[in-house]
């Protein structure tokens, strides 16, 4: 029997395996940020250990950074301490740091791919749950905890169980105005918040070949929201074209050798998957979440489901609590719901293609007088490219705030957050209670849907927006 892509990557990285032990995998890339790394570095110092492979370790500042200024003192005392400690830790241990004033600084899951730090066939870890984003390149990437960060820093290895595998085959025809964000939200709505638990997901099928690398990253980024450990997409010509001539990509003969290996990274036709799921994208409409986890999602033209429609009592109780928290009612439409803020950004939707779509949507319009809207590019490279194309001017003329790169309003770890009771149309990946601030109400949407909501001051069907 053949092997799946996940099996190939896992087996290729085993460096130690006993009959009764969990295998130890070699880690090709270790990505760091300021929030989950301080304790790991402190543990290294206490044990008088060094970073085993600093040249395979990269750090950035993203979670806590201010997006209105480059002045680190404006980030708050706790955030400033974490940022200062990351600077010292990287200097002491010889690690490359993309700090606030570095020309490549950005969100870790935006920066690493665009720099060519992420490459097919690699194992990649980061102390962040959305590390699966890098799986769009055919890399086995997953989030780890602080104790595991210490272990990887010290040994460049990690003990890792072999998870089950799930194949999601995408077919059909993508309708106009439908994006990768709509597709993945619809999949999560179908499979459920825990439907991928204990599995590594591989997205495949004819639809994948039509998607850009940025769209593929959106799919893999949100696979975690169906409970998956990681997500994968086999590399192809689109992948190679994206990576060629990137800062850290191989060059010359090394590039040719890499291509030979990358072209072996696919699931064999007779590979075994523990679960298989076929999904026709033809019927996917613009999606918007109504509840407090990403699986509580509907098409914009559908009513919020009634509690009676939930057969599972646990799901029914979750829905009831979500409706109370979100201050919504069953059998009503989100197109009648006004919003307070709009956030276009995060490691899900802050890349140049996302900003182009949002800018195209709002061009010639102005945001609603009662709405605050911010755009936060995922990196300085994205920001520079957007400004080169004049997208920043379109946003500013429409009343949006054009910010500096960072995680921003995706999570309440910095100055960008919602006030209690405020409602936000957000291009981020999580809508949990309090995710964007205490008492915040988050609705996940695509960049186009978020942009249109900013103009209308409420949720609208992007297909009818003019």
UniProtKB/Swiss-Prot annotation:
GO BP annotation list: L-leucine biosynthetic process
Gene3D superfamilies assigned to the protein according to its UniProt record, in alphabetical order: Aconitase, domain 3 (3.30.499.10)
Source taxon at top rank: Bacteria
EC number, as in UniProt: 4.2.1.33
Co-factor: note: Binds 1 [4Fe-4S] cluster per subunit.
Annotated positions binding [4Fe-4S] cluster: 347, 407, 410
A GO molecular-function annotation: metal ion binding
Catalytic activity annotation: (2R,3S)-3-isopropylmalate = (2S)-2-isopropylmalate
Keyword Signal part of the UniProt annotation: no
Metabolic or biological pathway: Amino-acid biosynthesis; L-leucine biosynthesis; L-leucine from 3-methyl-2-oxobutanoate: step 2/4
Keyword Repeat: no
Keyword annotations of the record: 4Fe-4S, Amino-acid biosynthesis, Branched-chain amino acid biosynthesis, Iron, Iron-sulfur, Leucine biosynthesis, Lyase, Metal-binding
Cofactor(s) of this protein: [4Fe-4S] cluster
InterPro entries: 3-IsopropMal_deHydase_lsu, Acnase/IPM_dHydase_lsu_aba_1/3, Acoase/IPM_deHydtase_lsu_aba, Aconitase_4Fe-4S_BS, Aconitase_4Fe-4S_dom, IPM_dehydratase_rel_enz, IPMI_cat
Subunit: Heterodimer of LeuC and LeuD.
Family stated for the protein in its record: Belongs to the aconitase/IPM isomerase family. LeuC type 1 subfamily.
Job of this protein: Catalyzes the isomerization between 2-isopropylmalate and 3-isopropylmalate, via the formation of 2-isopropylmaleate.
Name this protein carries in UniProt: 3-isopropylmalate dehydratase large subunit
Species assigned in the record: Blochmanniella pennsylvanica (strain BPEN)
Taxonomic placement: Bacteria, Pseudomonadati, Pseudomonadota, Gammaproteobacteria, Enterobacterales
